[in-house]
């Protein structure tokens, strides 16, 4: 706390930082809680022969936010894995990721770093069909890459380490980057895999479509069942809630500390002001009662004992209010009787 009771710059920065972090965490928590509530409110629809009749009776022949589960089936052609035999799917994602170590000039340590240098995703049209045989119904899945939880399975993964010569090693130390290698990954959504879709379910021209929902709700195509998906969202909500509460408590504690310091500083100023007024009032009463020839000596009297002459100048406040004996009798740490500031130096006052 600075002089005058004003908070210091560090306290302002701490309060501002915790407030901004708390607001950001609370915003994320609200967004996660909204997504969780929307998932809880999604209507579970059974993928069966009565699906079209259910949708035809729904307003606008659609369910705005529905949950449906089925097996993946390609419409026409399928995608073959480039590395695994007899592995067919409807979505294929190939990724090349570079791994390297970068020298940190601040910590003087080598830090692991990775970045995707190439990624390609191939898709073909596919449906969700019932697991049971003999049920003639299918749901066409539209825009699968727009989903926030695309349930791809890693079918191939290989790390290709970098081959380095002695001159390469020296060059890497000079440049501050040491390549470790390239990681090659293939992910696929296999034919026959179980998929849980959460989105807008629409009946259009006797065909059923699952597409991204409107009104800002999230689109899911997950390999997990709906209960596991909901549980994961609720766990995320609890985590962000705890983080928001922790930083909120830190913000409140910082604010309480600053306000308490200001309150104590204000109370101290009021007490010193009251003490000074009492000194002045007491001195005025003595002057009014004294004889004219004694008034000059009273004006120069020590405010503590009122018997000796003032003989000390207190620094840094500059008050002249005490005799030498009363100054010596002040308790440690010595403070000015008028303003209660710490006495750093005393200059003797010589009365003529």
UniProtKB/Swiss-Prot annotation:
Gene3D superfamilies: Zinc/RING finger domain, C3HC4 (zinc finger). A zinc finger (RING-type) spans 302-340. Pfam families: GIDE, zf-C3HC4_3. Residues 1-8, 260-352 are cytoplasmic. It is a multi-pass membrane protein. Pathway: Protein modification; protein ubiquitination; Protein modification; protein sumoylation. It is found in: Mitochondrion outer membrane; Peroxisome. PROSITE patterns: ZF_RING_2. InterPro entries: MDM2_MDM4_MUL1, MUL1-like, Znf_RING, Znf_RING/FYVE/PHD. There is a cross-link at residues 52, 273, 299 (Glycyl lysine isopeptide (Lys-Gly) (interchain with G-Cter in ubiquitin)). Ubiquitinated by PRKN during mitophagy, leading to its degradation and enhancement of mitophagy. Deubiquitinated by USP30. The chain crosses the membrane at residues 9-29, 239-259. Homooligomer. Interacts with MAP3K7/TAK1. Interacts with UBC9. Interacts with and sumoylates DNM1L. Interacts with MAVS. Interacts with TP53 (via N-terminus); the interaction leads to ubiquitination and proteasomal degradation of TP53. The zinc finger domain is required for E3 ligase activity. This is Mitochondrial ubiquitin ligase activator of NFKB 1. It comes from Homo sapiens (Human).
């Amino acid at each position: 706390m600075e002089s005058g009771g004003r908070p210091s710059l560090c306290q302002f920065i701490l309060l501002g930082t915790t407030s901004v972090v708390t607001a950001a965490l609370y915003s994320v928590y609200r967004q996660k809680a909204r997504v969780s509530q929307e998932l809880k409110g999604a209507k579970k629809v059974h993928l069966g022969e009565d699906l079209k009749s259910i949708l035809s009776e729904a307003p606008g022949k659609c369910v705005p936010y529905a949950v449906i589960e089925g097996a993946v089936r390609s419409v026409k052609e399928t995608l073959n894995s480039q590395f695994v035999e007899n592995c067919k799917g409807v979505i294929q994602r190939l990724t090349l990721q570079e791994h390297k170590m970068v020298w940190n000039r601040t910590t003087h340590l080598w830090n692991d770093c990775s970045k995707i240098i190439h990624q390609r995703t191939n898709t073909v049209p596919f449906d969700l069909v019932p697991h049971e045989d003999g049920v003639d119904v299918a749901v066409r899945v539209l825009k699968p890459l727009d989903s926030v939880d695309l349930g791809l399975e890693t079918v191939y993964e290989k790390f290709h380490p970098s081959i380095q010569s002695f001159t390469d090693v020296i060059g890497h130390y000079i440049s501050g980057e040491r390549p470790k290698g390239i990681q090659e990954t293939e992910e696929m959504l296999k034919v026959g895999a179980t998929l849980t879709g959460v989105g807008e379910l629409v009946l259009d021209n006797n065909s059923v479509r699952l597409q991204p929902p409107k009104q800002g709700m999230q689109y899911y195509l997950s390999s997990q069942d709906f209960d596991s998906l909901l549980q994961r969202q609720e766990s995320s909500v609890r985590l962000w809630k705890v983080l928001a509460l922790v930083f909120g408590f830190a913000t409140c504690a910082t604010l309480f500390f600053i306000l308490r310091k200001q309150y104590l500083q204000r109370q101290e100023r009021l007490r010193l002001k009251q003490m000074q007024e009492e000194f002045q009032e007491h001195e005025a009463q003595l002057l009014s009662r004294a004889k004219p020839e004694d008034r000059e000596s009273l004006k120069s009297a020590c405010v503590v004992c009122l018997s000796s002459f003032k003989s000390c100048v207190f620094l840094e406040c500059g008050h002249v209010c005490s005799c030498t004996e009363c100054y010596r009798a002040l308790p440690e740490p010595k403070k000015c009787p008028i303003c209660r500031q710490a006495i750093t130096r005393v200059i003797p006052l010589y009365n003529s």
